[in-house]
Amino acid sequence: MHIVFSVDDLTESFWPVPAPAPSPGSSSTPSPTQNVADGMTRSQSEWAFHRLINELSGSDSSPTTNTIERSPPPVQSLSRLEETVDETEDVVEIQKPQNHRRLPVDDQGKNRNRAPSSDPVDSSAPVVVDPNQYHAILKSKLELACAAVARRVGTVKPEDSSASASNQKQAQGSIVAQTSPGASSVRFSPTTSTQKKPDVPARQTSISSRDDSDDDDLDGDADNGDPTDVKRARRMLSNRESARRSRRRKQEQMNEFDTQVGQLRAEHSTLINRLSDMNHKYDAAAVDNRILRADIETLRTKVKMAEETVKRVTGVNPLHWSRPNMGIPFSNTPSASSSIPPNSNHILKPANSSTNTSAGLAQNQRVETANFLPEQVNREGMQNPFAPDSNLYETLPHWNHKH
């Protein structure tokens, strides 16, 4: 953003507080130490010129001799002058009457060393100089110097530095200042030697962004018609546009990455909660598993103790109770209280009074009921194991059949 001020607004704020002019009768000249507060250190030629002004102003009786003379302040920094001075250079011309000689105010300072008595033509007649005119001359010189510095520093491109330096020298050599008692204003007239080159961009006075102002400058360069400048401007525009696109794309990627990071953080927190729940469940299951194992060991111990008790009481191993098809001898006598013979090889035979038909039927029935006998014997033995006269065997129904 660039804001342009006028030269008058800038320079008037820089003038120091005016000091009273010396009295007409006094011929003393101020010393260099007296003007230190003015902010300017003057050479010997300037002091000679100042003495001439004092002598001329002392001989004048007009009301203009009592005016306040101002000394120009030192030139400010180039960075501030660059922002405030206009781009164009002008030549200052001040009118002067023909009966007065020209004041030595050129920028080279060659005529300042001349004494007032060195001119034989004007030594006889007194010369009257208005301090306001001298103030205007110094002010115009300051403005020209500011404009030259601003044009050289602020608006010249690197490739045109040599050409702009030559233009500055020509502009400084073409400055002419003229004075007149009746005219105290400064008149500016542009010259052809100080015109701006077409490839130098003009500064933007509107308040806008830096990119917009740069684009406008490049558009102005492209409109000038120089092929080199047009190509350079197009290349700069394309580079800036690509930079904008890359910044926009990078910003979109950063936004997308931020969104993904937020989603991943949410998923991470969810997974952490689930993991903590699973850890609690695992701990509870491990505790339950230890409890169940302890219960199983307790039950196994109880089973062993019960088996030992049964074996000690009955004298029979409980494991043999589940053995199938136990061979048990039986007697065909009708007596229910008969005991098992000690000889295991004893074979019971049927009675001789039975007929062949009844004998065959009895054999078939014994075969059919032989499988049910061990279960019944085991059940009766478990129900009353301590009965002294108990019979473990039961007579079959057909044994008591009458023939």
From Swiss-Prot:
| Domain bZIP span(s) in chain numbering | 229-292
Where does the entry say this protein is expressed, by tissue?
A: Expressed in roots, shoots, stems, leaves, stipulae, siliques, seeds, pollen, and flowers.
Q: Which residues carry this modification: Phosphoserine?
A: S213
Any idea which UniProt keywords this protein has? DNA-binding, Nucleus, Phosphoprotein, Seed storage protein, Storage protein, Transcription, Transcription regulation
Q: Where is the composition biased (Polar residues)?
A: 56-69, 175-195, 351-361
Q: Where is the composition biased (Low complexity)?
A: 24-33, 115-128, 161-174, 332-345
* Ranges for region Disordered: 13-128, 156-259, 332-361, 380-403
Which residue intervals make up region (Basic motif)?
231-250
Query: Which GO terms fall under biological process for this protein?
Result: positive regulation of DNA-templated transcription; positive regulation of seed maturation
Q: Region Leucine-zipper: start and end of each range?
A: 264-271
As one GO molecular function, the record gives: nutrient reservoir activity
Short motif Nuclear localization signal, span: 233-240
Q: Which domain of life is it from?
A: Eukaryota
- Give the record's GO CC terms: nucleus
Location in the cell reads: Nucleus
List where Acidic residues composition bias occurs: 212-226
Q: Which Gene3D superfamilies does the entry mention?
A: 1.20.5.170
Q: What is its main location?
A: nucleus
Record's function text: Transcription factor that binds to the 5'-ACGT-3' box, especially present in G-box-like motif (5'-CCACGTGGCC-3'), ABRE elements, of seed storage protein (SSP) encoding gene promoters (e.g. At2S and CRU3) and promotes their expression in seeds when in complex with ABI3 and BZIP53.
Task: State the oligomer form and interacting partners.
Answer: Homodimer. Forms a heterodimer with BZIP1, BZIP1, BZIP2, BZIP9, BZIP11, BZIP44, BZIP53 and BZIP63. Interacts with ABI3 and forms a complex made of ABI3, BZIP53 and BZIP25.
Q: What family is reported?
A: Belongs to the bZIP family.
What protein name is recorded for this chain? Answer: Basic leucine zipper 25
